[in-house]
Amino acid sequence: MIRYRKNFFLKHSLPLIFILTFSVFIYASSPSIEFKEVAPGIFVHQGEHLDVDETYHGDIANIGFIVGEESIAVIDSGGSLKIGNELKTAIRKFSKLPVRYVINTHVHLDHIYGNASFVGENVDFIGHVELPKAMALRKEFYERINLEYLDVPNDQSIQIAPNILIKPNENKIFDLGNRKIKVTAYSIAHTKTDVTIEDLKTKTLWAGDLLFTERTPVIDGDIHGFIDVIDKILMLDIDQVIPGHGTPTKKWKEAFLKEQNYFKLLRDEVRLAIDNDQDLQLTIDTAGQSESEKWELFDIQNGRNINKIFPMMEWE
């Protein structure tokens, strides 16, 4: 297990003290985000189905935590320091145990920018082996979004990358005290940085953005890889899935199959469009439209998905 050295935290934690304290002061009057216990010791806050635009406030992803007998694991920390602070405050309403791990399911900004709230000597950050690089590559872009939509200056858009890294198709088990969780990394799918977290005690899987319920699924990696990863997840022995966006469900196979069917339809219709020399804009206007009534934010996201996969599939 890789851990930060003590002087690392002295160096990097101290500059955060003022920022974290100041942020708590700013947002002290804000309503706390709410959590639901979806299985014993598993708490989830469900983000809103909003786009990253003028309506964005850093709270669109599902975030939460798992409580063991000795410690706690945070699963995704939200889209801002504000959300991270509210998550940290909410945890203390349910347990006084220390947070031992913060796990990021992937690189997207709505899942990672609360990490700084949990920096401490005994906290390890866990993620995909590609996550540190991906975070660094997107840093400036994310800072612009946080400044424009959240009014967060760059010195408060703090990235904390994982120090425990998991390679694709491998997993590691972490014990929270009579409660083991398994973190599994995948090859490119939703992104190049996807991991899932399985609570072995309750057979609950945190899928991150490998599963969307209600909201239109997002492809920021590879559509073929996404379809393949869903096939792997469908083979798991689990009872419940917590998606990255949308309502946790015990009808998890139906949820994954619905998502996979959308991807297969989109893949086939985009391939047909390319074979017929149809241009990108016409394909955006037509492909996948039979799915439009099944998903929220479809008119926004379906076109983005096509814009992502069309040029990739042209080279196949």
Show where each model-derived region lies.
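N-terminal secretory signal peptides that target proteins for export/translocation
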Residues: M1-L10
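Bacterial N-terminal signal peptides
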Residues: S13-V24
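Metallo-beta-lactamase
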Residues: S30-V38, K133-Y186, T191-K192, L200-K201, ...
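Conserved beta-strand hairpin/beta-sheet module of binuclear metal-dependent hydrolase folds
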Residues: P40-A90, V195-A207
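Active-site neighborhood of phospho(di)ester-bond hydrolases with catalytic His/Asp-centered motifs
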Residues: I75-S77, R100-H108, I126-V129, Y186, ...
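Active-site HxH/HxHxD metal-binding segment of metal-dependent hydrolases
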Residues: T89-N169
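Divalent-metal (often Zn2+) His-rich catalytic cores of metallo-beta-lactamase-fold enzymes
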Residues: E198, I227-Q278
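C-terminal regulatory/interaction regions
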Residues: D275-E316
